[in-house]
Amino acid sequence: MAKESSFFDKVISLGPEDLDKDFLNKYIDVLSNKRGGGYWIWKHEIINSLLKNIDNGDIILYCDAGSSINTLPKAKKRFKEYFDLLLDSKNSFLRFETEKQFLEKQFTSNELFKYFDIGLDTSIANSTQLQAGVMFFQKSYESLEFFNDYKNVLDFDINLITDSYRNNQDNQFIENRHDQSIFSLLGKIYDSIVLENETEFRNRKELQYDYPILTVRASNHGLKDKVKLMLFKSIYAKKTKFF
């Protein structure tokens, strides 16, 4: 659907086979973990690789596999507004919040907070965590530095992206969100443009038709729907998938 939307100059789909061999060798132990194909450690690598190969001022929209693009009139208008927000500002990042109740300190380890010198009583720790499944990046010196800082986290302590510290946390902690925790804190440190959750509409389906990016990948579907999707994959790929 992304290709048919006319929203993009280019649409790229990537998989494990597209990762650089040096990256694979460096993080082989983490990548062997089934969760997120290695705690989603690959995500920053593919975005950074794409960012390096576009012109300054160009914009990348990263979406997790399974996301759907809505091309209804109001959604198209909103999509253009996303780009205008970036192009009309000096900011290189546009991000979306998760659901309001999901606070940073509930889904980020103390060790990661300490790395960034962020206290649990700060506004960042008590703010809503940002999504890592839908992110806009405009190429600039600032956005390239963002990914250098991401790599520095991993070089300092690879366990900051894993579940290694899950038993050393305060009572409010629920679980580490791995790549999302790092992307979220860096997004706030870099003063991203932050919008409320405009991608997940499972509990407010009546609103989804006005927004362009739908993170429907986590929806529950029965066997009948899965069989339909397998049989008519080429057709469904050209249709917006709603919640």
Regions found by a protein language model. Give the residues of each.
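Glycosyltransferase catalytic domains, chiefly GT-A lineage
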Residues: 1-243
